[in-house]
UniProtKB/Swiss-Prot annotation:
Organism: Caenorhabditis briggsae
Function per UniProt: Subunit of the V1 complex of vacuolar(H+)-ATPase (V-ATPase), a multisubunit enzyme composed of a peripheral complex (V1) that hydrolyzes ATP and a membrane integral complex (V0) that translocates protons. V-ATPase is responsible for acidifying and maintaining the pH of intracellular compartments and in some cell types, is targeted to the plasma membrane, where it is responsible for acidifying the extracellular environment. Subunit H is essential for V-ATPase activity, but not for the assembly of the complex.
One Pfam short name: V-ATPase_H_C
Keywords for this protein: Hydrogen ion transport, Ion transport, Transport
Complex formation: V-ATPase is a heteromultimeric enzyme made up of two complexes: the ATP-hydrolytic V1 complex and the proton translocation V0 complex. The V1 complex consists of three catalytic AB heterodimers that form a heterohexamer, three peripheral stalks each consisting of EG heterodimers, one central rotor including subunits D and F, and the regulatory subunits C and H. The proton translocation complex V0 consists of the proton transport subunit a, a ring of proteolipid subunits c9c'', rotary subunit d, subunits e and f, and the accessory subunits vah-19/Ac45 and vah-20/PRR.
Family: Belongs to the V-ATPase H subunit family.
Signal peptide positions (record): none
InterPro entries, alphabetized: ARM-like (IPR011989), ARM-type_fold (IPR016024), ATPase_V1-cplx_hsu (IPR004908), ATPase_V1-cplx_hsu_C (IPR011987), ATPase_V1-cplx_hsu_C_sf (IPR038497)
GO MF annotation terms: proton-transporting ATPase activity, rotational mechanism
This protein's name: Probable V-type proton ATPase subunit H 1
GO-annotated cellular components: vacuolar proton-transporting V-type ATPase, V1 domain
Length: 451
């Protein structure tokens, strides 16, 4: 997959607004006469407006040199009217889009003034006008990526924090696609990835993915593209495992019919395994994917006739890695380790028919040691997840072990389940009820209790 894919974007609200701004009729003479801007500022902006071709504009910039930068800065800072600030920023954004090497004119003046080139624009990010804010994002992005000077330190933190705030405003913000587009460009550079991840950036992207779920697949693709770019950094790939990223994109994998969305989800999942240098974290990533039914979804995707070589390769990679994990997770040793640590969660064994068929009797080994542990968890644990899983396992033991019902009742398991039927948590009540039903009937399959 190539970085250039982020150029194929929908026409955003921002772009439509920019078209209107470019048609604005300016009256720079008014501000010159009132001495809000200098004559040199007036001379430059009028001359630049009259330039009709790219070559003409390059000539104007080479003639005015640093005066061009001073003029731009004065037009943004000395004139308070939003429409003129909008217009000036649009001129600058268009100028850089036409030739990104023009970022150097801001860098050269910044060096002379002993300040950062980004400082000319960062103050505009607090403005209320969202067009001004997002045009500033666009300008800063071009400078931060294509310029020779990279944004760092407090300036980088402020820039990334502003972008994060922009995408967490959600669907009500018509400019969200513009902020995401900037991220698609910024996250090519590793320090920018780290900075964004360190301010809970994944959570904001997940929020944006949810808030724009009814806005079409293109914005969905762009947001996941940002996630994919972040996972090229090992630290970022590790941080992703602490949140709900895998759960979020696995849901999309199971519902999206767009090949490009499926492709970027698979590429992101692959990176979460491949980019993690720590073997333990690789296994954790694969475990989360198994728990979120990625392997099942990959099996379903195999029925589709994909032509994309990268997509097919990513599917094969994930299937191979996840099957390794399933083999380990469905081993009784892994289950026993989970049980002894008291950290029950929905790992594959708990819902695997083959696992219980082959291993249910082992809960009776060593004077029913493991079965007693499960019942103790039902009696003493305050963790709803542990209670749900323990109740499930008691039910599966009864279901697959001929004398399971008798052993559970003798150890007080039935009473423990009955007490759980009155707890506040609805999930705990649900799994306790299922287990209690299995204690009371003989034909388990008639219950239709596939969970």
């Amino acid at each position: 997959m190539v970085f250039g894919e982020n150029q194929d974007l929908i026409r955003t609200h921002f772009q439509k607004e920019a078209d209107k701004v470019r048609q604005m009729k300016t009256n720079w003479g008014l501000f010159t006469r009132s001495r809000m801007i200098a004559q040199s500022d007036y001379d430059f902006v009028v001359t630049y407006e009259q330039a009709e071709t790219e070559q003409d504009r390059s000539t104007v910039l080479s003639v005015f040199k640093e005066k061009a930068v001073y003029a731009f800065v004065h037009l943004m800072s000395q004139i308070s009217k939003d429409d003129y600030v909008r217009y000036t920023l649009t001129i600058i954004d268009d100028m850089l889009r036409e030739d990104v090497s023009r970022t150097k004119i801001f860098e050269e003046v910044a060096v002379l003034l002993k300040r950062s080139p980004f400082s000319f624009f960062l103050g505009l990010l607090h403005r209320q006008d969202q067009y001004i804010v997002h045009t500033t994002f666009s300008v800063l992005t071009k400078m931060a990526v294509f310029g020779n000077i990279k944004v760092t330190g407090d300036e980088l933190d402020y820039f990334m924090g502003s972008l994060k705030e922009a995408i967490t405003r959600g669907i009500a913000n018509d400019y969200i696609a513009t902020a995401v587009r900037c991220m698609q460009t910024l996250f090519r550079i590793d320090p920018y990835r780290v900075s964004f991840v360190n301010i809970s950036g994944y959570e904001s992207l997940s929020h944006a993915l949810y808030s724009t779920r009814k806005c079409g697949f293109q914005i969905q693709y762009q947001i996941i593209f940002c996630m994919w770019l972040l996972t090229f950094n090992g630290h970022a790939a590790e941080v992703a495992l602490c949140g709900n990223l895998i759960q979020t994109i696995s849901t999309i994998l199971g519902t999206s019919h767009k090949e490009k969305v499926i492709r970027i989800v698979l590429a992101t999942l692959r990176n979460l395994i491949a980019s993690n240098e720590d073997e333990y974290m690789k296994k954790q990533a694969a475990r989360q994917m198994v728990q979120n039914q990625i392997l099942v979804k990959l099996d379903h995707l195999e029925n589709r006739k994909f032509q994309d070589v990268d997509l097919i390769d990513d599917m094969a990679f994930l299937q191979k890695e996840l099957k390794k994990v399933v083999e380990v997770l469905t081993s009784f040793e892994e289950y026993e380790s989970e049980l002894r640590h008291g950290a029950l969660f929905w790992s594959p064994p708990h819902k695997c028919e083959i696992f219980w068929t082959e291993n249910a009797h082992k809960l009776n080994d060593n004077r029913q040691e493991l079965l007693k542990m499960l019942i103790t968890m039902l009696e003493k644990s305050n963790d709803p997840l542990v209670l749900c899983v323990a109740a499930n396992d008691i039910g599966e033991f009864v279901r697959y072990y001929p004398r399971g019902k008798m052993h559970v009742e003798q150890l007080g398991g039935k009473e423990a389940l009955m007490r759980l039927l009155t707890v506040p948590d609805p999930n705990v009540r649900y799994f306790a009820l299922l287990a209690a039903q299995k204690l009371m009937v003989n034909h388990w399959k008639d219950l239709g209790l596939e969970i």
